[in-house]
Amino acid sequence: TSADYSAITTWGVFGDGLGPPNLCLLGATRGRWDYPTLRQKAIDKFEEHKPDSILIEKKASGQSLIQDLRMAGLPIFEFQPDRDKVSRAYAITSLFHNGRIYAPQSKMWTKEVMEEARTFPTGNHDDYMDTISQALLWMRNGGYIDHSENTWLDKAEQRVYNRKQVEQAKSKSFYY
């Protein structure tokens, strides 16, 4: 079962000037971590990628993590699921079908993430898919992706995150 695992994914949002912004999976890790280890992993990933936002599911250990990381000054946002995992995954499939999701071929974790996505929801694990659907829904609902042309074009530069990492990953990437 996947309940024993915690997963962390890091995303970059980038535009090419020809359409709505795309997303690149910049990092993924999962494990069975006790709370102090989970907290340190979250801080380490923040230091590694310097994201503008950290999204944490507000249940189980996530509640304590939200409080601790906010007190540490990190840019925390809560995610409260309002539907089941399969429904959330279904809600983001158009982003994959439209070729808007990138992932680097050269990273060890890419194969693991892709295998989990391929076998979801009947596979052995769903931890990455849970973080992926939460992140993509949050970015779409928050206006970071799926803008109308008039909205996103004049704000494109403000919405590009982790530009250097995204460009490096994009040069060695494939469409999901």
Task: Describe each model-derived feature in a short phrase.
Residues 1-79, 103-176:
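RNase H-like, metal-dependent nuclease domains and their acidic two-metal-ion catalytic environment used
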Residues 87-90, 172-174:
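Residue-level detector of intrinsically disordered/flexible regions characterized by low predicted structural confidence
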Residues 80-86:
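Conserved helicase motor
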Residues 64, 86-87:
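Short secondary-structure boundary/hinge segments and terminal tails
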Residues 88-99, 116-119:
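Short, surface-exposed amphipathic charged segments that create phosphate/polyanion-binding patches used
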